[in-house]
Structure formats: structure tokens, C-alpha cells
Amino acid sequence: MGKIKKIQRKGPPATKRPPKAARTESTDSALGLDAHSDLEKPATSSDDGFEEPTPKPKPSKKTTTLPEPVSIIAQKKNKFRTDDAKNVKPPTLEEMKELRDTRNLFHSNLFKLQVKEMLEELQLKTKYTEYIDNWMESFTVFTQRLKDGLVEKSQLEVPLNVDKKISGFIFSKPTKEPQLIGAASTGTLLGPKIVVDVALEMPKDCLHKDDYLNLIYDQKRALYLTYVTNQMRSDPAYSQDKFAFNYHGNNPLKPVLELTPAAKHVSKHLQLRLFITAPQSTFKPGRFVPWNNNIRPTYYNDEWDEEEALPSTQHYNASVLFDLTLAQNQALLDKAFKGRRNFQDGLLLLKVWLRQRELDRGFTGFGSHILASFIVYLNQQRILHQSSSSYQVARTVWNQLANTDWTNGITLAPASGQTEQLSTIAGYYDVCFMDVSGQLNLCANVPLGVYQRVRAEAKLAVDLLNDMKLNSFPYIFMQKCPLYTRVDNILKITNYSSIQQMLVLHSKPQMKYDFASYGYPQLLQILTELLQKGLKQRVQAILPIETVSSAWPVESKAPIIGQAIQLGLILDPEHAYEVLDKGPSSNDDPEGSAEFRKFWGEKSNLRRFQDGSITEAVVWGTTKDAPSKKRLIVRQIVMHLLEHHLQLDSKDIQYIAAELDLVYQLSPWFKVSKVKTKLELQQDTDAEALSPNVIRCYDDLARQLHALDDLPLEIVSISSISPVSRYCEPMPVLPQARMMADHIHASHIQRVIIQLGQSGKWPNELSALRALKTAFLIEIGEKLKAQCRLNWSITSEGLLVLKRGFCFLLELAHNKELALLKQEVTERGVTKYVDNPESRALEQRHYILPKVSGALHSLHQSHSAYGPTVLIAKRWLATQLLDDGIWPPMATELLVAHLYQQRNAPQAIAAPQTGFMRLLHLLAHSDWNGELFLLNFNSSWQEQQIGDLEHSFRSDRQSYPPLALATSYDQQHAGRLWTTGESPSLRILSHVSRLARHALEMIETSLQSKDLRFVRPAQLFRGSSEGYDLVIQLKSDLVPNALSYDLGSPFVSFDQPNYLLPRAGKDPLAAIVHQLRSAYSDYAAFFYNPHGGKELAIMWRPPAVFAPKAFKVTELQACTLCDKGKVQVVRETLVEDFKVLLKDFYLRISTPEELKREQREHQNPKRYFNAKPQDNESCSKSKKRKLAKAAKVQAPLKRKSLIKSRPLKSLS
Amino acid sequence: MEEIEGYTVVPLRMSSDALHCHSVYMREHFIRLMDPNKPKGRTLFLLNIPPYVTEESLKGFFKRAGNVESVQFAAKPGKDETIKWYEGTNEPFSNVRPPFIFKVAYVVFQKSSSIGKALAVPSIDLFHSSGESTIKTGMELWHEESPNIWPTTTEESERAALAAKNSEADADGWVTVGKEGRNAGFEQKESVIGRLEKKRENDTKTKELKNFYTFQIRESKMQNIVEMRKKFEGG
């Protein structure tokens, strides 16, 4: 939807406000505010500010019609002017009406303005409408010039694949003029690619009355199309245009001509499609009722028992009827839509909505012509009024879609026209919506799953509109939600032989006749039935994901389509991961039991359960399995079913589920057996499965803390604020923290906030208070040691406690500290409390984070995919070299929480991988400038508050950070607490958007391609090495590797990993990078992978920063003297600084290209900065040795690693 | 010796073989309003000091020009910049550190004769004769930082801090009267004052009829419209 651009919030157009007009008695009565307007009722045709169905008197007219009370007003006006000239202007009738209706229909003016603006943008430019009109004129002339005659073999291929071809087709020239159909006719063309449909009717002469049988009609139709195409190509008016054939709606029986005009000004966005239809009277009316057979088994050389009734071909019949009834249907639509801007706009809105959801695609798509017909239907049923506004049209359609059931059939035909029993017809189709002729089912090809999906989406749209706490516009219209991001797992079968095998062995002959041997719908039916039966309530919906067939040049042969299938599975998280499928009891229902056994094959066993029942059952795992393993149960079942029933080998099938979950698994390099612990650990465990261990240990610690005796003050509350406690820590946390030489060493520390009971004796001075806090912590530490035998040590941040191999950092929170930090004394001696960055950080850590942590924890309890989604997202950001300093980790967590909390899909996400893809979508397509992400936990914010916040956000955008996040717990800091102007900065934000778009592109290509497998994690989870100016390689033995699955660095190949335990809470690399950023961010940007990355990538700021400039005392930072009294920043000097700061850590500095070249050539790596040829090798070596020596003295703990480093380097 | 606009420019070297060095711009410190901590004639003013340079290292270097009384940093030249720079860093139990950015330095010598000597140095060398840097960076720095950052034992400083609060009569015989005591008065807080003012306002306000006269009704309707406009059009 490139066409719908960001809708800027604009003030109301100036013209809208009428001039100061008469304030008549009627305005006063209008002020009575009788605010009742039922939205669903068509009778109240209230105007909501959209284009009026009937022209309205202009306000200017109004003033002229009511000239009398002017003299009175003159006085009054003056009176009001004294107040506030702008706002207190007497209202006009129109304004009153508009204001009131806006209030009744929308929560805010914003939605109205946005919709209005979108519709304005969707309006077709006049150059297109003019072009279409001219084209139609010339085409009509062209068709009149056509001559009758026998169709010889033309140089064009007939765009149809049939087994038995007919010969001797005689072309007769059309007797009726070609007509615009579909969107072009109803005036609802939608960009960015405008497709204009034109129908040309074959005259009756071309067809015989027996042509209904065995695809003869379709062949004649195709021949007719070919002939017309041929003639057009030789006509000078069209010879420049681009001709191609395509299948309409992926239906191989419906070839259409796609014509891209050569005219420059339209060729980019305009396309014309030519349909061939036939007059309705060609065949006998009852010929194509659903139960008739029009393709005989003999056509496919099949035997058919004479006695048996011929199988019905309802889908084929509908395909022919589509052509026959087209004119009549179009006439009906035209009648309803022509000249009614409100209906047209309503349909446009619905079309946008449908297209963003990709539900209108392909053979099984819920096309927009169904929606158009439905609007007519609602109008007929008097549910939609002629004068309903476009918003009401859309809303009513959604409401009716959600609340009606078409499976029993609805019909457009008048009572007299509907000759056959509706329920009988409905029995032949999944969904039934009869057209005006009473013969064609408009929804013939729509499977039940797709229809249910449309209904669910419609229901969601209504819910979103009703949600007063939300501006639903972006969710309904702007957000692109491709189907693959809405399904949890995807089954993809593209293997030719498997497809053929299924069609030949498992498709019923009746289905073959019904779909005229088109493979796709048959496959769909076979697979859907089987999976639905096997997965039962594990799955909420099975949806076909179709790719639209691509056009082919008219000279080449028509391709065979439908040789691949992709199904999306939406899982029900409540049932999908059950490990057991129980059959009927073998005693009570032996037949059912046998059938169950037959269905499941060897997997089914007779089992005795605890309640004494003995039944057949299938077991897919144990209840103790890790969640990531359980998520693969559905995959297991599907694979088994396909193998057992359809004899498909697992290598012929692609089942896309949990491929990316790999990234938070424990690295295979790390051997779990080396960890000394009482816990049972598996080698193939992951961060998600390990989190509960930490949480359990924390719970124990909390219990012990509560139970401590003799503390001067009671511990009131203990809360954990570490990501682990909300399942958001992407690194597997193993119990390996330990005491070494009086220091605690741990890879992670878990932060815990303690609050003590009230006491008035706390000092009123910051340092005294902090001293007392420290004393308290020491007291707690000593008590823990004495009573619970836990090791502890005190640091400047808090009390480190070691328990069962996990390390906790206890902090004391006290209100007074916060107050003292905020305290300021004004000149008058009055104490004021003002937020400052330090107090904000403290408040966030001590008071807000515990609450948000709790809320996110409970979010994970209700959506078990939340945690793992965050894990994947954090890993992804880390591998793109975005560390916590430039992208706050809480931003990731809250954005993912936003995805799970906002109901932007009818079903909750059950698979983390899907969650991650949706996050990528969010990152790639969000309008950061216009959107504030609000997490209204427990709905504790009121409408008014939300309104105020959004108002302030929009009117004062500059004061908010580029990415604005707010939760319901941080009201006074709303939008400014979790992110700042620097993290993430605007630059980083757009960088992330770009990365996300790139990742999505990769995912989409792999999904759409027939041959490619799903994207490998290594493709997504390894950053690009391009765009960086310098890479500082760090010594690999000084930086511990991440415990999670490492997919490699963008710069160098794998090295021997090390898993050294750093001192608890110390991350020297992060600290140095922080220093570098604070000192040098004006000149360079720094990137590294916080998950064990061993390179620091540097990007210089634009060259202007390094240009010579005049001497100014205040702007001398980092400047060296250059010629002519000017100064400039020299990059080499800065590099020297980096080296100083990274002393002992850096191995060498080079450009990424050099590094790559060296990696390729496996050269002996040069030790030092290459750009410095004078750097003499021996000197640097001796210096290095000295440094190593120094480091040894300074850091005895690192001795082992440093010694180890030498042979390591000599290896490379 | 290079000079620019009255500043002497010297390189700041971190090692004896350093090629690319930062330039430090120095001159005698002189402004009209002198700061007692930066006495006239004895203070050397240095511009563009790299972030990692410490007070001690500069002090150590400038010893060769004469005894150094103190070295102070600031983010930029200016009156209270030095105070701002060190704000909060000297308090016990505080994790506040001075910012890590390019800065200016004031070196105060004991004798004014040292200034000339200092301005004559060819380069500022921040390394020992052995070649080792006088500034700790990298691994050294991060390993040295011990968890016990406070100088005295915790209990002592705690006592000291608490003692500071309960001050008795000071040297001049003045006693600080706090909010303790019998007649403490109200707290001089913004919220308290605000509450009091509001109360007074409410008291002075007479009870008035709000929806009685026609003009009042008309005005309230007007107000209604204004609010609606604000809600649906404004923003």
C-alpha cells in the first residue's frame, strides 16, 4: 500500500470554519445536546463530516439567507471577542451538527481526519480517469471493426491447458459494446497498481447449445480472447502496448489479457484487463445448478458406473456462471454505486482493509467484489441506508460480516428470482452468497477457513472501533499484516512428485471433475481435512497462503499452476502443546477405538490412565519437556499424519516452525557437564527453559530474607527487576557463579529491590542516608551469612549475595532518597521537588521497574510466547551490533509486549517466531514520529488520561524522544522514561527500521519462492560488515563468549571460544564503550555485539566534522593545529585515543575490507594498526610483552588466560 | 613552539613514540573576575585536555616547572564550570563521576615563576621514563577498581554523617533551628505552600450563583462549545 502514505495530522481546513454567522434560536436548541445516535441504525442518517450524499447549503449561503438579526449579533460579537476571539465565536448550525456527530461517531476528531485524508489520497487522479474513458472509446471502435471468420492457427498460444482441443472455431464479431466492470465501473479503483477490468461479450453465434459440456465453453472463450488479442496486436493503436496473459484469481480456466499501455504518463501504475464473457441466454437456465454435472468422467477417460448419478461439478459450474451472470451483476452494482460517493468511499475503505490483510488473494480469496455485492445486499435488506456515510457503510459491513453466517446461504436475488432452495444450494458449498440471478454463488471458491478468518477480522475491526482507549485507525487501515505474520506455523509442499502423488492417489475422482483437474483446490481440500481431523482443537484455523500467479507473454505457452501449496496454521495456545491425544475408551466404543488406531497408525497405543480408563492414546512427549520442545509437537503430528496418510517423506515437506528459536539455545561449545550443580541440566537446553531455575532460586532467597531475625526494620517487599524474572534474558543463565579469592564471579547478576518498613529516623541528608542504607545492607549480608550460610560482598551498587550458583544484587529502595535527589531550594527558600536524570533513573529502577516487571511476568503467563519472542528479538538486535547503550533493552521488551497486548490480530500469537516477524514488521513500518506506544497494563489509564497524553504528544512532539514508550505505571514521566533522545537516537531508529525491512525481505523471498528453504538463522542473525570505517579487533581471550548459540561475527571467522567468568556485575568492554561514546560520539559511532562480540566497529561521522575550522576557545575539543591559523579534528589522533582506552584489549585495528581479505587468505594477522607503516614490529612486540606482564601483575586472576593466549595467537 | 591567538600549542604525548597527538593550548589564566581558587599570576590555563587525562597525571608532569598547588578541570572555560564539574563527586557513598569528555584544566602553581617554565615545555608527556603511561586505562583500570570505594570504613563515615546533622552550637555560637522543636513552623515546601494558598483563595471566594442569570446560562453553553471545539478540532 505504497499509496497510503503517512497521514499527517492536520488541523481542520480553514474553509470548514464558517464565518461568524447568525446565532439563531435554533442553535440554542441544538445546544440541548440530545446525544443519542445509534450507530447501527440506518434511520439516523447523521452526517459524520464525510462527503455528504446530498449537497448541502454552503455556509456562505446561510449567512445571506438570514440577514435579519445582524444588528443584535453585532453587540454580542463584541462581547465574545473580549474573551477569546478565537474559540468563542458563535457557532453555526452546520458546525454544531458536525461537532455533535463527530462526538457521537468517533472518539476523536483524529480518526475522522485520518480517514478523510486517506480517502482523499486514494482518489484517482484525473489523468487516469481521462485515459480510461478515451481508451474505452477507442476500444469500442476497435471491436466494431473486427470481422467474422474462422480462427486459423495464430502465432499466439491459446492461454489454456486442456487435454482435448477443439478445432474450427469461427469468430464472430461482438454485438455488444465492451464494458467496464468491477472497480472501474463502480468508481472504486484502488492504487498503487490500478487495474481496470473490461469485459467483452462473445456473441451467441460463437456458441452452440451443447458447448456447456466438457470445457468446450472455456476453450471457445480462450480462443476468442486469443483472436481479439491477435487483432489488437496488429492494430497500430495498440501495437506499442505490452501484452501478457494471466489467470484471473489463479483460476486456470479464466485466462485474461493484461495490457500495459505504452502511454508514458500512465504506464507505470495502470493496467487494463480484458475479460471475455458470454450472454446469459446462451445456455438453458438450469444448466449450471450446483448439482448438475458438466464435465463427464469419460472426458478424463475414467470409468463411471452407469447406474450411479453423475458427480456434481458445482465449482466448475460457478466458474462458467461467473461469465454468464457478469453483465447482470454489474448492472446491479452500477445501480447501487454510480453517483453515490458515500458507498464508493465505504467500499474503498473496506478494500484497503481487506488488501492489508491479504485475504483477497488467489483462487480461494475473498474478493472485493463480494464486499461490493454485500453492500448492495445490505442496502436491499434496509440495513444500510442510501445516505449512510462512508464510515457507516464500512462499519455496518464489518458488523454484519461478524454477526451473520453465510454457511446457510444468503441471496441477492429477489424472492421471485431465487428459484432453487437456498439451503440446497448452500449444501454444495462451504460458504454461500447467491448473486442477483439466483444462480451463481459469489463465494463458490471461498473455503470455510478463509471466510471465518474474514469474519474474525471484521469482528476485530468493530472491537477496535469501539475501544475508546485507542485510536484504531492505524490498526485497521495502515498496518500491513501479511498472512504469514498472522499464522504460527507454515506447511509448504512444493515437491513436484509429492504433489502428483497426492493428486493421483488421494484425490477423489469427483473432486477432479469438480475443479476441472485443477490441482490446487484438491490439495487444499485433502490437506485441510486431514490436518483438521488430526489436530482438532490444537489448531484454530488452517488458511491457504496463495501467491498470485504471474503473467506470461502472449507468445509463450500457458503455465500450469497450482503445483505447490502453502498452508498457514493458527494454533490455539491452550491446546496446541498438549502432549497426549486420547482416543475413545476401548471398552465402551470399540469401533471408535479401532478407527482411532487406524487414523494414527503405529503411534497409537493402548494405555491405562490414572483414572482407571483404558484407551487408545498417542503420546507426543512428556509434560516435563522444555517449552521450546513442546512447541514442536504440532510439527511432529503434522509430519506423522502426512507420512501415515499421504506417504509423504519428511524431506519433501517444509514445515516452518521455530527455526529461529535456535538463537537462544545454549551454545554447543559450552559443556553443561562442567557446571557443578544439583539441578538437572540438559546440553540442548535454552534460555527459556533455564529461567525458571533462577526464578525459583530467587523465590527461595526472598523467603529467607523475609525470615531473617532481628533486623532493625522489617523487610516489607522484595521484587526482582532482572530480565530473567520476566523471561526476557536471552543468555542462558547457568548456576556457575562462585566465590574466588574473596570476589564473587558471575556471568549475570540478578537485581533485587528491597523495601523496608516505615521509620521516621532516616537522616535528611543524602550521603548520610546512603551510608545508613549501606550499613543496613551489610547487616542483611551478615545475617544471611549467619542464618542461611550465604556468601556475600558489598559493592558500591548494593549487596552481592551468592546462592546456589546464582548471584543476586540486593538494593535498598527508600522514598527519602528519591525525594532528596529531586529536592531543590528556590531563591525564596522554598523547597521544590524537580525531576532530574538521576532521580528519574532511580525512580525507574526502584519503583517503576518492579511493577512493570510484574506486569510483564504476568503477560508471559498468559501468552507463553512473549518471553521467547523477546529473546529472539534481543538476540537479533545484539547480532546487528546494537548494544544496550544505543538501544535500551527495555524498549525491546515493551515493544514486544505492545504486540502481545494490542489486539491487532484476532488471535494471540502462539509461536515466538511469528511474534518476532511481527516485531520486524513493527520496526520496519512504524511511523515513529506519529506513534506513541502505550502499554496500558490492567487498563488502569482512563480515556481522559490517554487523550491528554496523546494530545500533548502530538502538540509537543519535540520534547519526546524519537521512540516514545509509556506504561501505565510511569504516568508523570510518560513517554520519556524508557527511552531518551540518545538511546535510541533518530539515526539508530532509522537504521533499525532499515535492518528490519531487509530481514523481512529475506523472509518473504524465502517464503514465496518455490525452491528456497526457509531463511537460515545464520542469514538473519549475523550483522552486515558493510558501512563501517574501522574495526578494532579485541583479544579473543579477554572477552568471554556468550553462552547462547553463536552464529558468527560479521568480521572474522570462528575462534576458540572462552567462557571465563567475569567479576560479578563487571563488564569492562561495555564500560569502555560507554566511555568512548561519551567522549567521541561527536566524531564517530561505535558498534559491537554485546553478546560476546570480539570486534568494535567504528563509523566516522560525516567529513564536515573533520574539516578545518577557525580557532574558537569553546570549540577546540579534539582539535589539532593545522595551516593558516585553523584547527581541525584528525582521525588518526582519535584512533590513538581509542588505543589508549582499549589498552590490553585490542589486538589490532583495520578496515573491514582488510580484515576480510586476511580472513580469506589465512595470513598471519598483523599485530598493529596497518595504516602505520613505521610501526616497527619488534618494538611493538616488546611493548606488548611488557603490557602482558603488567596485566599479569595487575590481574592475577587473568593469568591463566593470558598465558593461554600466546599459543592461541601463534596458531592463527 | 607554535602559537595561536596567544595560546602556546604543545602536543600531549602518551608514549615516547606517539605520532598523532592531541594539541593542548595553554596560556596564563587571566580574567577580570578572578576566582580565589585560580589565583592571578600563578594559574596556567589549558584547553583541549583529552578525557582520560587525570588531575594526578597533570600534577605529576608539571612538577618539573615548580611545585603544583592544585589541578582543576572544567567542561569549558567559565565562572562556575569547575564547581559544576565536581558537583556530587566528593560526597561519600555517591557513584557520581565527572563526565568523560574533552575538558579544560587549571594548573595552580605555588610560585608565579613556574608559569613561564611551564609554557616553555616542548610537549606534555604523560609517561614515566620507563615508557609506561601515568594514566591507567584498559585492563588496569577496570581491574583496579575495587568494590570498596569509600575511603574510611563505613561505620565511621556513617557516624560522621550523622554527627553533621545533629549539630550543636557552632563556633560563633549559632544554633541551627530545624523543624524539630516546639515551634517549628510549617515546612517550606512547594506543595505545602501551594495548599495554603489554595485554602486562602477558597476562603476569600464568596458563594455565588452559577446557573441563575440568563447570561450565565448562555456563557456556560458557550463554554461547552469551546470545550467541544478544543476536543474535536484543536489538538
From Swiss-Prot, chain A:
Compositionally biased spans, kind Basic residues: 1197-1212
Compartments, record wording: Nucleus, Nucleolus; Chromosome
GO molecular function, one term: RNA binding
This protein's UniProt keywords: Chromosome, Nucleus, RNA-binding
Gene Ontology terms: cellular component: condensed nuclear chromosome; CURI complex; small-subunit processome; UTP-C complex
Gene Ontology terms describing biological process: ribosomal small subunit biogenesis; rRNA processing; tRNA export from nucleus
Sequence segments annotated as region (Disordered): 1-72, 1156-1212
Functional note: Part of the small subunit (SSU) processome, first precursor of the small eukaryotic ribosomal subunit. During the assembly of the SSU processome in the nucleolus, many ribosome biogenesis factors, an RNA chaperone and ribosomal proteins associate with the nascent pre-rRNA and work in concert to generate RNA folding, modifications, rearrangements and cleavage as well as targeted degradation of pre-ribosomal RNA by the RNA exosome.
Assembly notes: Part of the small subunit (SSU) processome, composed of more than 70 proteins and the RNA chaperone small nucleolar RNA (snoRNA) U3.
Family according to the record: Belongs to the NRAP family.
Protein name (database record): Nucleolar protein 6
UniProt organism field: Drosophila persimilis (Fruit fly)
Gene of this entry: Mat89Ba
